[in-house]
């Protein structure tokens, strides 16, 4: 009997240890902030609001979730804020944080943050104002060829982002010197669209989800998309490939946190964001926006960002 009691006590100790190890990881108490390093509206904002909504509805986190807007410097202001914030603060990110570094526009590097997740990807498009004499992407490129430095192409929010780089890449593949393109930079997609509608620019390079509501309203038309084939929601929008330019390019969005997050804190977000991206609500939002689900956890994200950094360096240097 005595041996049985001792054995039972040993088993209980091991079970308690297992329970402690299996306990869900936690963040310090306090409200969670999701930083949008741009103006309200646009893809980062839509993504942040979707995350906030699912975290609240599904009660994935116990504390409240706030969205904080920090626009300026092509994401720089927002990422500096995250860099100095508590462990309850996370931020939207994209390839812009990589290109800012590669172009020497920022002292911040990806190593100054903790990669937490990649969430989704979507396609880039070239938009034209209603009544434009141009009809497709090739028309835009031909116009630049005929009038170098005269055709205004808008993008937002920061130099070196995917909106700008995707257009540069398509133009380069068509034989256009990037210095012959007159770019106009805007602080938000809303400002960009309004400039396009007012014919202040000849075309705008942007994500498909940002262009969609204005295309549906008939305010703009779409001249090209960077997908490999026509998209079901946009059957009349030709790909660059159809126009003789073998260019396929997707834009991704993700989440980062402050530097030096603990393994427990990283694990917390691995679990929380996995639940978010697995939820029906998230999948509905993905479909509404014509995005593609592209969830990567923290470890996969770190590896992905290393690959993307090399990819963007090759685009910018031509090597």
Swiss-Prot record:
Keywords in alphabetical order: Signal
Annotated signal peptide: 1-22
Pfam families xrefs: TctC
TM helices/strands, residue ranges: none
Stated family: Belongs to the UPF0065 (bug) family.
Name of the featured protein: UPF0065 protein YflP
Species this protein is from: Bacillus subtilis (strain 168)
Source organism phylogeny: Bacteria, Bacillati, Bacillota, Bacilli, Bacillales
Gene that this polypeptide is encoded by: yflP
